[in-house]
């Protein structure tokens, strides 16, 4: 968003809720708590009336789910960029977007509310814009990047910024390494 690439990052993850002693490889329909577990595919679909993202048990011994994670990246200019994700949050408490804070104002956007908010520090007015985004999207562009990669392999032109996709992937890998090692690590391109 700022045109700068992350050069290093540190990260932490937490796993306090999605833990348990259920058998490895357990699927929701095979669990005795299928109709009562708040995270089961049955409850999510039929009681909460939400889209089911899968039916693997969130509380199995082999689950890779984390409750949340945070990363702080540094850029060459010294700017700090923070990213947080939380998978325990439900319904309207969820957020996905970014907030940019500067010396003259700030701007933020949220994919879930489809809003962009702009605050100019010299004006008492806050401006909010609504936008539309295709329903059911992950917002990360993973599918589009994969299709563009295949298009380039076939000799075609990319429709998205593949370099930005590689920066994103390198940043994610650095964040994972930083969380595992408990230290700042370089973002390698």
Q: Model-derived features: where do they sit?
A:
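Contiguous beta-strand/loop segments that form the cofactor/metal-binding neighborhood of enzyme cores
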Residues: 1-113, 145-152
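C-terminal helical cap and adjacent loop that interface with cofactors, partners, or active-site loops
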Residues: 65-79, 87-189
């Amino acid at each position: 968003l700022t045109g700068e690439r992350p050069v290093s990052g540190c990260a932490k993850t937490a796993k306090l809720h999605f833990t348990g002693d259920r058998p490895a490889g357990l699927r929701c329909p095979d669990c005795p708590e299928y109709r009562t577990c708040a995270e089961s595919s049955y409850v999510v679909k039929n009681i909460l009336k939400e889209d089911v993202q899968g039916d693997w048990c969130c509380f199995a011994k082999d689950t890779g789910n984390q409750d949340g994670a945070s990363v702080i990246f540094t850029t060459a200019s010294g700017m700090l960029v923070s990213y947080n994700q939380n998978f325990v949050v439900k319904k309207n408490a969820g957020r996905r977007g970014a907030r940019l804070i500067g010396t003259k104002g700030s701007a933020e956007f949220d994919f879930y509310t489809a809003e962009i908010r702009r605050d100019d520090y010299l004006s008492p007015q806050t401006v909010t814009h609504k936008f539309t985004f295709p329903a059911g999207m992950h917002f990360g562009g993973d599918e589009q990047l994969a299709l563009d990669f295949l298009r380039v392999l076939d000799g075609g032109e990319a429709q998205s910024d593949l370099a930005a996709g590689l920066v994103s992937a390198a940043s994610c890998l650095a964040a994972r390494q930083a969380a595992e090692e408990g230290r700042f690590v370089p973002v390698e391109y």
